[in-house]
Amino acid sequence: MSISRRPVILGGKWNETMEEQTMKYGVIDVGGGLRGIYGAGVLDRCLEEDLRFDLCIGVSAGSANMTSYLAGQHGRNKPFYDEYSFRREYMSVHNLIRKHSYLDLGYVYGTLSNAGGENPLDYAALARSPAELCVVAANAQNGEAQYFTKADLHPDDYRILMASCCIPVIDQPCVIDGVPYFDGGLADPVPLEWAFAHGCDRVALILTKPIGLVSSDARDKHLAHLLQSHYPAAAEGLRRRVWRYNTAVQRARELERQGLVCIIAPDSTEGMSTLTKNRAGLEKMYAKGKQDAEALVRWMQNAKQDESVGT
């Protein structure tokens, strides 16, 4: 991937006083199951600092974090991780037996999130936000990434979030317009290239595990074997997921040295894996996110200063 210092801007912000487009800033939250509470902490800090991005990209749990961020709902994401996830209705063997899905995404992004629900998404505020939204899911039939936009969200219809968070094997695929989808991490776990291709000059990347942590693909390969007979293309995506993730993070580190990317990542997972329900670990990850976001605040401030000097 070759990225120029000033790529073509698609839909960047227009500065009328300068009669030119200003830099376009993107943010990516890669999710990571319940570790996504770290990203929730980062984005809550961004709201506190009134830090705004032009293109917001979410993968898996990161997509849910992004919608609350764009709606300006500070603190909304946190209870989904440290409170609701402990409920049987959210995730349980009971769900797996009754509904053939360990995670009841209809409960999470329907019952809880719809108007009148316990913790509704402010759809009107989300729709008013001038920022672009991208939600990444994986087409279960061909294994390709599907990049949903804000236009694919509707009041009380948050299926694209369900699609992006749908973990293969333990969940039935989420079907939208006849197409089955799985977690976006199968197709594009770190959509950095997509962000730059769509006009971003600089990108903030939120990871939910340490940058140097080497993940094994043994679990993915085992799950891919179970998925192979029904969704072979998705199974192949699962086999390649760790490689794709590592490759993209390595590229992000190169771009970080050039000042084009800011990586925000925890120094520890606090023992948290994708579906680990540990209240102490969740609280620590959220606190880490808010604290680590200080580096993002400084990076954005410096970038804005450089931009003003350049104009």
What spans do the regions from the language model cover?
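Patatin-like phospholipase
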Residues: 5-59, 67-311
